């Protein structure tokens, strides 16, 4: 990784919120697990290249599925449409001991910044 998590956590959360360019750089690392926490329908409309999983944070089973699916020994990079749902997902995973980075502006910010998206 290009940076250390030591001392990077904010007062109100124990995960790192990053901008589009930081997120793009972070997910270049193949050790990072990239998760889209939007609905399957939203994911099907387009997603960030390299996304490993689509686990809908609005589902009651999110925590169970995420903790059973995501390796705890690898950092997790989360995004949603605008950054709200992914913050919820990030709090859940960080509280479970995961190292989490969250795309503050979500997929909308990614697209608005001119980054590549996978579309059907």
Name the predicted role of every residue range.
Residues 2-32, 40-75, 84-120:
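Rhodanese-like catalytic fold shared by cysteine-dependent sulfurtransferases
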Residues 79:
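Short, surface-exposed ligand- or partner-binding patches at beta-edge/loop junctions that are enriched
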């Amino acid at each position: 990784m290009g940076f250390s998590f030591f001392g990077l956590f904010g007062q109100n959360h124990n995960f790192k919120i990053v901008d589009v360019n930081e997120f793009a750089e972070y997910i270049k690392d193949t050790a990072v697990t990239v998760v889209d926490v939007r609905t399957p329908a939203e994911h099907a409309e387009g997603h960030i290249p390299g996304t490993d999983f689509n686990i809908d944070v609005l589902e009651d089973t999110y925590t169970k599925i995420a903790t059973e699916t995501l390796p705890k020994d690898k950092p997790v990079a989360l995004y949603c449409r605008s950054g709200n749902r992914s913050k919820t997902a990030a709090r859940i995973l960080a509280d479970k001991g995961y190292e989490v980075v969250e795309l503050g502006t979500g997929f909308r910010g990614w697209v608005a910044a001119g980054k590549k998206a996978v579309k059907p």
